[in-house]
Structures are given as structure tokens and as C-alpha cells.
Amino acid sequence: MTSFFKLKKLIFLSAALLAASSSAMAEEPNPIGDWWIIYGNGVPQKNIMYVADATSVVPSQKTKGATMDAVTLVYEEPGKPMNDVYNLEAQCSTGKVRFINGQSIERLAYTMRHLKVANQWQTPKEFWVQQALKFACAPGSRAKNDMAAVGKMEYLQMIEMLQQMFFKLAPIQQKSQMMDNIDSLLELKK
């Protein structure tokens, strides 16, 4: 099996796992997501984009009163996986989340592995998890919460688009980093 077909099969499996929280989406052969960037770390050559799918925000069938949310982490760094996918439950009234499951797709081997997740209810500490909670609980405030709509597309298209974004960001981030380094050397920065 060629690498491209292996990748496409694994991306499809990952998308299916991501869609497992939404039965309507899971029935589609190539589900279309409504993608939003909820956070990005902005580290040159090590960018990570945290992308949530609005179609995954549905009432949980597992926990009464909770809302499901799926977040994909797309990595730029070659030594990292291509992406990780986490399915979370959010309790909007208490401001708590818990991880249901997670999967990772390795960049070169195109293999999928299951990630260990802490499945107890917790107050989010990491910023991206806080953003995931806001994404699920305040859909009308996504733009106000510094989230950017990416558009409606298939999962593989979203991954490819973000990889292209990393490619376009690289020279801009390198120039910015170079200017910061020069400022530091000249002690112009306070």
C-alpha cells in the first residue's frame, strides 16, 4: 500500500474516531467539519495549531448535561506526530472537562496509536483546554474568545491547509525572531 493511501486510510480512521461523538457525522463517508482554530503556540518551526470542530459539539450520550467536543492538534515539527485528536466532555455549568479518548497519527509511518488520557473531571489548566471548554460552552462568543473560523471541509483538507499555513508562516516567524534577537543583542528591548 502506498504511503498516500496509508495516510488517507489513517486520516479517515482518525476522522471517524473524532466523529464518534456525533452519530449524524459518523454516518457520512467523508464527514465535513466546521473547523475553528482555538489556539496556536506560534513557536517558529515548532508550531502547533489547536483546531476544534463545531459539528462535534453535541450533547453527550455518556454523561447527562455534558457536551462533547473534539479538538485536533496539528504539529509542524518533523519529530512530532502529524496530529493528535482528543474527544472531550465539557460540563458548562461547572466549568470542568474530562478527556474521553485520544489518538495520535505518526508522521512518517502513518500509524495510529491511542493516547492515555486522564478521564476524571477537572478544571482546565492548559490554555488550549480552557479554549476547548469555551468553544463547547459559548458557541456565540467564539470570535470574541480569539477563535478563528477556518471553514467547512473534510478532515484531510483541514490538515493539509494547516500544513500549508505552517509553510507560509515560516519566513515571517524567522524574520520576527531574527529582529527580536538583534534587539536583545543591542539591548534595545526592555
Can you name each region flagged by the protein language model?
Residues A19-S23:
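N-terminal signal peptide c-region/cleavage motif recognized by signal peptidases
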Residues A26-N87, Q91-K190:
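N-terminal secretory-pathway/extracellular module detecting exported/lumenal segments
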Residues T2-I11:
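Bacterial N-terminal signal peptides that target proteins for export
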Residues L13-S14, A24:
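Cleavable N-terminal signal peptides
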